[in-house]
Amino acid sequence: MSAPKVLVVDDEPEMADICVEVAELAGCEAAAVHSAEAFRASAVDTFSLLILDLSVPGMNGSKVLRELGERGSPVRVIIVSGMDQTTLESTATLARNRGADVRGVMSKPVRIAQLKALIEAALA
């Protein structure tokens, strides 16, 4: 069985690199994109998990979640953003209600052990 594929979407390359490394520690193949254009060019539905920053310039993270839900995308999502936990939880609930498969949220700065546990749980 091949390793799950994870796509990290974050405009901060250092943060994206951390998320990629943590996903790899969790046994996944991982890639990162840093712009709205690169995200739109990626075949998101071919990934098992999307780690999504809601605040990428040129991209509305809430709209991305809505579109994933509306088209019944099979990709699971973890939201990682600098927003407060309450806002992230509300965004996740709204996205789930619209059909997106949001498996967890985390405020930045990420805690490596917690992110690894979220990734493992999302893919279980």
Over which residues does each language-model region extend?
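Alpha4 helix (beta4-alpha4-beta5 surface) of REC/receiver domains from two-component response regulators
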Residues: 63, 83-105
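Acidic catalytic/metal-coordinating carboxylates
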Residues: 34-35, 60-66
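Acidic, metal-coordinating helix/loop segments flanking the phosphotransfer/catalytic sites
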Residues: 31-49
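The feature encodes the CheY-like receiver
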Residues: 57
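His-Asp phosphorelay/catalytic-motif detector in bacterial-type signaling
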Residues: 46-48, 71-78, 101-102
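C-terminal output helix
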Residues: 86-87, 107-123
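Conserved acidic segment of CheY-like receiver
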Residues: 2-14, 19-23
